[in-house]
């Protein structure tokens, strides 16, 4: 794995040719995440349950030096919204346990690609953590916006359509979303540590169930600001309804075909 830089902007690009060797289970490769195939992955870091129901191991085809896979169920065809509440809670707890271990990196990205259109090559339920040696430009820009703001834009989200509210979280359809039906799950408290993992897991499950009405593929990403104390972490969830095309690639500007005000009613 190496880095290259855009000769105009200096923006970093990760060069990882070994990722071309990833197995594509959608194209007939055997699933390396199923029970009985443990020798097809690097030695595990940890597991939950015996026999295991959650398993964590290094990514065999890492985009950076520190990259991990969290297989979230032993069942090949399981879905996150079908997990028992305590199982989903444990998945979220493991996210943050592993995040703390990898926090020596400049940035840690927790994300899920679910479905072929979302970028998954293996349909077996899993998420990933990637530690980066630099803070991505998007995170830098958002962190600077938090630092400039007179008050935190995520501590008061009343201007955004509310999908659901719990004691510790708000699930909203944000204005200015780049993608149709994009959602955020935002903690009410301005803090870097997650509150009530069971509550967060339940909202994630509800969001996944809602997104399945729209698309069979989705992504989620935990957006965090380890270098900016005024940052406010949140989860971004995007059902994949369109392919990013030439206009978006060429301009960096997105066209959203679903107004946020209409989304809350659908969910």
Regions found by a protein language model. Give the residues of each.
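Active-site microenvironments that recognize anionic phosphate/pyrophosphate groups
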Residues: 1-124, 130-195, 208-267
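Gly/Ser/Thr-rich active-site loops/lids in small-molecule metabolic enzymes
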Residues: 198-202
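Aromatic-lined carbohydrate-binding surfaces of glycoside hydrolases
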Residues: 205
């Amino acid at each position: 794995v190496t880095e290259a830089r855009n000769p105009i902007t200096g923006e970093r690009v990760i060069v990882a040719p070994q990722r071309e060797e990833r197995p594509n289970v959608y194209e007939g490769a055997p699933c390396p995440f199923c029970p009985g195939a443990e020798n097809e992955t690097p030695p595990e870091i940890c597991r939950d349950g015996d026999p295991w129901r959650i398993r964590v191991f290094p990514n065999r085809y890492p985009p950076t030096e520190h990259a991990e896979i969290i297989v979230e169920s032993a069942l090949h065809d399981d879905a996150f919204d079908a997990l028992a509440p305590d199982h989903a809670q444990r998945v979220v707890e493991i996210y943050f346990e592993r995040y703390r271990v990898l926090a020596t990196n400049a940035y840690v990205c927790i994300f899920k690609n679910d479905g072929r259109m979302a970028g998954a090559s293996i349909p077996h339920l899993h998420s990933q953590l990637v530690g980066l040696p630099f803070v991505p430009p998007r995170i830098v820009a958002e962190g600077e916006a938090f630092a400039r703001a007179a008050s935190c834009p995520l501590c008061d989200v009343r201007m955004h359509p509310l999908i659901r509210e719990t004691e510790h979280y708000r699930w909203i359809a944000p204005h200015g979303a780049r993608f149709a039906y994009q959602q955020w799950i935002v903690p009410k408290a301005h803090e870097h540590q997650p509150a009530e993992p069971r509550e967060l897991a339940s909202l994630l499950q509800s969001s996944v169930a809602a997104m399945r009405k729209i698309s069979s593929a989705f992504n989620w990403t935990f957006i965090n600001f380890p270098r900016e104390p005024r940052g406010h972490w949140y989860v971004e969830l995007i059902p994949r309804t369109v392919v990013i095309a030439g206009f978006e690639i060429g301009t960096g500007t997105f066209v959203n075909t679903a107004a946020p005000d209409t989304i809350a009613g659908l969910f």
